[in-house]
Amino acid sequence: MGCTLSAEDKAAVERSKMIDRNLREDGEKAAREVKLLLLGAGESGKSTIVKQMKIIHEAGYSEEECKQYKAVVYSNTIQSIIAIIRAMGRLKIDFGDAARADDARQLFVLAGAAEEGFMTAELAGVIKRLWKDSGVQACFNRSREYQLNDSAAYYLNDLDRIAQPNYIPTQQDVLRTRVKTTGIVETHFTFKDLHFKMFDVGGQRSERKKWIHCFEGVTAIIFCVALSDYDLVLAEDEEMNRMHESMKLFDSICNNKWFTDTSIILFLNKKDLFEEKIKKSPLTICYPEYAGSNTYEEAAAYIQCQFEDLNKRKDTKEIYTHFTCATDTKNVQFVFDAVTDVIIKNNLKDCGLF
């Protein structure tokens, strides 16, 4: 007599198959979910990378969303010129044209009365005259001696355009805006059949205690370093060189037991600013022992070695380093493509899916 399954047994087999199928689907789904943590000291470019993900992997910023950044563009522009004027007093730099002193006084009055999201023709005129002044330019060239937004020159050089009454910020204007990240900003997007969850965490010291609960189940960490920070001090601690702070932080992340199996991707960012700065500000400010030339290639390679040498598990853990310019969409697109390939190779090969 043949061996036949009872209806009950058949149901049990079907149930078992379904459970296996569900487990496999759950496994595949989990394998396709990528949790990325963006870490780094304050103003290293983390939030700009997040904005680029929206531009590259989503539809970018709509006209309506761009309009909402108008107030931030104006605020960044006004705060930048104010920071330069204040620094002139501290650094004892005179205006090239004595008449600009009246403009400076006017600037503080008009800026204080300015309505959010609006720039009057009078205020724009004052800022334009000040920015053209040789004393203001001399102070701008010494910006490493005080705190100034990276985007200062970008906005101030383009004042004619951004001061127009019908001005709508471009994607590039939005990328250049600076708003301090407080707390954690989460972004979702799909790329190469993977579902990314990217977490941007505030980099200032006061924000770092909020990181800890993000650590669980992280696929990869993108650690951002501003190359151009080598001759700057922290906004929150003027005794601390920004690059040294970044190295300390990278050391603690790279060698953390939480991240033994986590891919570490190092973005040496702001390469465009670094390339300009290294011509006039020597790397020995940050690394007194540096004996190389102040060329972009040699100085950048030296900084790369300083960070990669902090890795105490070189035999088992690789650091994937990329030189980036977070405001350059094509560069970020190219680098992120390479990063995704590393993630696929490292984190999904175990599942036999790729």
From Swiss-Prot:
Molecular function per GO: adenylate cyclase regulator activity; D2 dopamine receptor binding; G protein activity; G protein-coupled receptor binding; G protein-coupled serotonin receptor binding; G-protein beta/gamma-subunit complex binding; GDP binding; GTP binding
Keyword Protein biosynthesis annotated: no
Species of the source: Rattus norvegicus (Rat)
Principal location class: nucleus
Record-linked InterPro entries: Gprotein_alpha_I, Gprotein_alpha_su, GproteinA_insert, P-loop_NTPase
Region of interest: G4 motif: 265-272
Positions with a binding annotation for Mg(2+): S47, T181
G5 motif as annotated region, ranges: 324-329
Function as written in the Swiss-Prot or TrEMBL entry: Guanine nucleotide-binding proteins (G proteins) function as transducers downstream of G protein-coupled receptors (GPCRs) in numerous signaling cascades. The alpha chain contains the guanine nucleotide binding site and alternates between an active, GTP-bound state and an inactive, GDP-bound state. Signaling by an activated GPCR promotes GDP release and GTP binding. The alpha subunit has a low GTPase activity that converts bound GTP to GDP, thereby terminating the signal. Both GDP release and GTP hydrolysis are modulated by numerous regulatory proteins.
SMART domains documented for this protein: G_alpha
Topology relative to the membrane: Peripheral membrane protein; Lipid-anchor
All copies of domain G-alpha, residue ranges: 32-354
PANTHER family: GTP-BINDING PROTEIN ALPHA SUBUNIT (PTHR10218), GUANINE NUCLEOTIDE-BINDING PROTEIN G(I) SUBUNIT ALPHA-1 (PTHR10218:SF359)
Alphabetically ordered keywords of this record: Cell cycle, Cell division, Cell membrane, Cytoplasm, Cytoskeleton, GTP-binding, Hydrolase, Lipoprotein, Magnesium, Membrane, Metal-binding, Mitosis, Myristate, Nucleotide-binding, Nucleus, Palmitate, Transducer, Transport
Annotated compartments: Nucleus; Cytoplasm; Cell membrane; Cytoplasm, Cytoskeleton, Microtubule organizing center, Centrosome
Lipidation (N-myristoyl glycine): G2
Stretches the record annotates as G3 motif: 196-205
One family name in Pfam for this protein: G-alpha
Mutagenesis or variant effect for G2A: Abolishes myristoylation and palmitoylation
PROSITE patterns attached to this UniProt entry: G_ALPHA (PS51882)
Residue numbers binding GTP: 43-48, 150-151, 175-178, 200-204, 269-272, 326
Family to which this protein belongs: Belongs to the G-alpha family. G(i/o/t/z) subfamily.
Protein name: Guanine nucleotide-binding protein G(i) subunit alpha-1
Impact after mutating Q204L: Expected to have lost GTPase activity; inhibits the forskolin-mediated increase of cellular cAMP levels. Does not inhibit interaction with RGS14 at centrosomes
EC code(s) of this entry: 3.6.5.-
Catalytic activity: GTP + H2O = GDP + phosphate + H(+)
